[in-house]
Amino acid sequence: MNIFNQLKQDIIVASRQLYNNQEIANTATIEIPKDSFNGDLSSNIAMIIAAKESIAPREVALKFKEVLITLPYIASIEIAGPGFINFTIKADSWQASIKDILQHEEKFFEIDIDKSRNINIEYVSANPTGPMHIGHARGAVYGDVLARILQKVSYSVTKEYYVNDAGSQINDLVSTVLLRYKEALGEQITIPAGLYPGEYLIPLGQILAKEYGNKLLTMNYAERFKIIKSFAVEKMLDLNRKDLADLGIKHDIFFSEQSLHDKGEIEETVKLLERMGLIYEGTLPAPKGKIHEEWDNRVQKLFKSTKYGDSQDRPIEKADGSWSYFASDLAYAKDKIERGANHLIYVLGADHSGYVKRIEAIVKALGKEQVKVDVKICQLVNFVENGVPVKMSKRLGSFASVQDVNHEVGKDIIRFMMLTRQNDKPLDFDLVKVKEQSRENPIFYVQYAHVRTISILSKAKELMPESYNNFESGKYDLSLLSSEEEIEIIKLLASWTKTLEASAKYFEPHRIAFYLINLASKFHSMWNFGKENSDYRFVIESNKELTLARLALASAIQKVIASGLEVIGVEPMNKM
């Protein structure tokens, strides 16, 4: 029995019975109180009903108490504050969670929220102009783990990478590769400021020189540009794909911005918005304060972004008449929606925080308020190597690449560490700490817990083979898991699916990492307590019945840790 789901269902039934209202009960929450003094679980159902029925919350809470106290798994109910209903669950109901995890594992870990949601999540979308730096890795891991979580709770998810292959930075890439091509032909070159001086483009020039000789130099500009652009973008994308694959990340779709131009999708989108009355000719408001010399006060085509909450309307054309980047964004969102997505998630870096409102406006307009949109910002990673910050600039040619850091510490450490802070908070990535074998290193602490559970089971199998066979046959008495430490761990195990649901609901993958760290901490504490008091050891040869129960507990811990690590794309370690 999933206690959280069972209590929610019983509250819905009680709501229908008491107030003939089931729908509003679906919005009620079941939470774990921060203070254990307030019981095991708490619900706000009384306050929700009270607001709807114009009744005092405590009066509603008392009526719910009368009905719910009769449930077989409820030990007691208390009314707190303005009307919170606090539940204390009977120990045997918590203990039964262990049996669910071990004997009904697939059902316990299965979560089915809403299969009607078709989510498109776009993340990384780094310009294909060079190797990915560690800052990109944070958004990559966040987006990938969020997609995994959403899939885990039964949403249909498309993972997408938007290839920015139509902007000025691509022109700079082409110019740089052309110089490297000339260099490969024997010409002395200088990389001007603003281009890409990194050595990673040298091999591209050499490949072109080998394939074309000096033929590219005899071509006209347009023909040469087209060949170099196609070649360079594909090579850089191959590089990015490999960097991502080495992190355990694979997108379903790589979508080309250039394709929007080539297929006329931008023109089509603009015409649609014109028919909707959302495009007009006007001027942009002057910037606040001192007017910048680059401010463009010409009459131009603008999208009515302010109608949907943006701070200003947005231009869809540049001064030279070409489409703006914003116009591409309009067409791209339309394309996603036409492919069937009814919920768009954008994962952006900290340097794009100003894009949130404009993206929301785009989707609200094109989705006609029927398509959900969420824009998540990943803050900077403060990467330190020997106490010296690493420059993160592809233009300077000196940066901490994903490949470098992956080679240094491995993908599992990168993935886990990127989730040790909420995505909208800056993250310190300490290369020294992530290599330590101590509780100060969170991924080591979690992996060590997994290894220890396997060690416990192996030890029991070796020392007590008959008892181990009984454990595997499900012959254990879970009522023996009655100490405060054991019940606390069991409650945490029972809350695993609740944590997963909350991570999906609030788009917060860090909750999984925090949960695993918490579970590992409680397990290690009990293990260490067993060193001081033999009664708390997991394997006690003189007490077969208690050993059987604790083997069940250890196995449940192992399965939940493995499930959590699997969700975040980290391989559980079986030995160290």
Curated annotation (Swiss-Prot):
UniProt cross-references to Pfam families, sorted A to Z: Arg_tRNA_synt_N, DALR_1, tRNA-synt_1d
Organism phylogeny: Bacteria, Pseudomonadati, Pseudomonadota, Alphaproteobacteria, Rickettsiales
GO molecular function: arginine-tRNA ligase activity; ATP binding
Gene Ontology annotations of biological process type: arginyl-tRNA aminoacylation
Homology family: Belongs to the class-I aminoacyl-tRNA synthetase family.
EC number: 6.1.1.19
Enzyme class at the top of the EC tree: ligase
Subunit record text: Monomer.
Protein name: Arginine--tRNA ligase
GO cellular component, one term: cytoplasm
Gene name, Swiss-Prot/TrEMBL: argS
Enzymatic reactions: tRNA(Arg) + L-arginine + ATP = L-arginyl-tRNA(Arg) + AMP + diphosphate
Motif ('HIGH' region) on chain: 128-136
Cellular compartment(s): Cytoplasm
